[in-house]
């Protein structure tokens, strides 16, 4: 009996941005991912980039992230450019958040965004 090959699990890191000012998904937000290197001196290594789709979701990256290594990663969401494109003044030029990633797990980062504030949490 032949076994079925494993199915791709998709990216290990996804996100979803909702514009809480308008109540709609934040489409077209540029997102970058960096890995923190802690020794000998702290620095960040660029890993990947993407853009939120029409539903405000990050579902793919410009590189394969299905097997990211454990470590501390930083998401950088270019929120200022997003609000500029809407003609809305905002306080934050970008939102950056550091998260601890364990290899083999999926991480979903929801971002509830407004011009003068934001909320985030680990989603499922």
Swiss-Prot record:
HIU hydrolysis also occurs spontaneously, but more slowly. One of its GO terms (molecular function) is hydroxyisourate hydrolase activity. GO terms for cellular component: cytosol; nucleus. Catalyzes the hydrolysis of 5-hydroxyisourate (HIU) to 2-oxo-4-hydroxy-4-carboxy-5-ureidoimidazoline (OHCU). SMART domains: TR_THY. Homotetramer. Its EC number is 3.5.2.17. Keywords: Hydrolase, Purine metabolism. GO terms for biological process: purine nucleobase metabolic process. It is an enzyme of class 3 (hydrolase). Substrate binds at residues 16, 57, 121. It catalyses: 5-hydroxyisourate + H2O = 5-hydroxy-2-oxo-4-ureido-2,5-dihydro-1H-imidazole-5-carboxylate + H(+). This is Probable 5-hydroxyisourate hydrolase. It comes from Schizosaccharomyces pombe (strain 972 / ATCC 24843). The keyword Hydrolase applies. InterPro entries: Hydroxyisourate_hydrolase, Thyroxine_BS, Transthyretin/HIU_hydrolase, Transthyretin/HIU_hydrolase_d, Transthyretin/HIU_hydrolase_sf, Transthyretin_CS. Belongs to the transthyretin family. 5-hydroxyisourate hydrolase subfamily.
């Amino acid at each position: 009996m032949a076994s079925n090959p494993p199915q791709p699990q998709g990216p290990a890191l996804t996100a979803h941005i909702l514009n809480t000012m308008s109540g709609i998904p934040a489409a077209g937000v540029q997102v970058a991912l960096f890995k923190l290197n802690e020794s000998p001196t702290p620095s960040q290594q660029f890993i990947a980039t993407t853009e939120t789709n029409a539903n405000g979701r990050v579902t793919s990256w410009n590189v394969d992230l299905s097997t990211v290594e454990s470590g501390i990663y930083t998401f950088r969401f270019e929120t200022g450019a997003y609000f500029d494109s809407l003609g809305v003044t905002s306080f934050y030029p970008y939102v950056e958040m550091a998260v601890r990633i364990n290899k083999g797990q999926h991480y979903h980062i929801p971002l509830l965004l407004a011009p003068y504030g934001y909320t985030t949490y680990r989603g499922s």
